[in-house]
């Protein structure tokens, strides 16, 4: 009967599972060695430093150390959230993080799809190579380019004045309203080509017969993209979106620090700059640590919520 058949099949499965032998361990010794190295690296550089989080709950004094500094509970967190500057920094970080996420995410997908539509292999490789190059430029170089382009005598002002869009040049870095779009543009220009790599890989894994079937049904390029390409890369899009949601508070440090000035600091400062200012420059390590813990906890919560949302809607999940 059915129960007897299931019992026999389970017994067969158990019989086919061979225990890990010393011979198997020796055969995989290189893999096991590097796995052990990475585990040790993770423990030393990712888990042991978490002991420093105790500073956020202390009136930390470097001369006393973590073990002997006075325990103050959540006092540093209360000070943090009563600081108007920190609340403004949270607003800036969230705003720039969301804008950067949407802008870089969408442009990378669109760029990968458009690149896939180029039929000339030589042309496609040339465009790919050119689009990857900005990723390898440091933010110091990128901000230098932006300063030259957006200065009063820069090419952007010259073009806008010559086209009579502006009556006179403007100082983009003196108006807070321009700062967030400038940061978003810089991130898109720098990372679009690099971020498109994984989408191009996902597109190449789509079965070519699906495109052939769509062509037989009379589908043009747009319909092939809509009904074949986008559904084919949807799992990749969802997974990367879930991973990037947790990085919303990683809105950046270098570009904001290098482009920011006293005129726009109310819109340019992020949590990382706040931590640098209070935690390192002014030596208040407890406040800096508390701000870092807040940032980490919010990132974890965002990832969990995004993952649960994807699970509820039947999409791909991280865990």
Locations of regions flagged by a protein language model:
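A structural signal for multi-pass alpha-helical bundles of membrane permease subunits
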Residues: 24-319
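Short, Lys/Arg-rich, polar N-terminal cytosolic tail immediately upstream
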Residues: 1-24
């Amino acid at each position: 009967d059915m129960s007897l058949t299931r019992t026999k099949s389970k017994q067969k499965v158990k019989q086919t599972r061979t225990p890990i032998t010393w011979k198997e361990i020796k055969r995989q010794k290189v893999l096991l060695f590097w796995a052990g190295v990475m585990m040790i690296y993770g423990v030393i550089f990712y888990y042991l430093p978490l002991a420093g989080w105790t500073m956020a709950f202390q009136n930390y004094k470097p001369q006393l150390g973590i073990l002997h500094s006075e325990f103050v509970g959540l006092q540093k967190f209360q000070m943090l959230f009563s600081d108007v500057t920190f609340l403004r920094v949270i607003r800036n970080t969230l705003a720039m993080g969301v804008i950067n996420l949407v802008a870089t995410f969408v442009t990378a997908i669109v760029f990968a799809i458009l690149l896939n539509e180029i039929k000339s292999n030589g042309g496609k490789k040339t465009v790919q190579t050119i689009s990857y190059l900005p990723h390898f430029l440091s933010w110091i170089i990128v901000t230098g380019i932006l300063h030259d382009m957006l200065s009063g005598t820069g090419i952007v002002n010259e073009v806008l004045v010559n086209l009579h869009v502006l009556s006179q040049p403007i100082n983009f870095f003196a108006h807070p309203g321009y700062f967030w779009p400038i940061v978003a543009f810089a991130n898109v220009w720098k990372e679009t080509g690099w971020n498109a790599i994984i989408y191009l890989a996902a597109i190449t894994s789509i079965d070519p017969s699906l495109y052939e079937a769509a062509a037989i049904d009379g589908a043009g390029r747009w319909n092939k993209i809509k009904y074949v390409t986008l559904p084919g890369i949807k799992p990749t899009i969802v997974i990367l979106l879930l991973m990037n949601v947790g990085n919303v508070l990683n809105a950046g440090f270098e570009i904001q620090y290098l482009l920011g000035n006293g005129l726009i600091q109310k819109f340019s400062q992020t949590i990382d700059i706040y931590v640098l200012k209070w935690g390192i420059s002014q030596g208040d390590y407890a406040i800096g640590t508390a701000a870092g813990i807040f940032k980490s906890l919010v990132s974890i919560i965002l990832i969990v919520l995004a993952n649960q949302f994807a699970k509820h809607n039947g999409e791909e999940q991280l865990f």
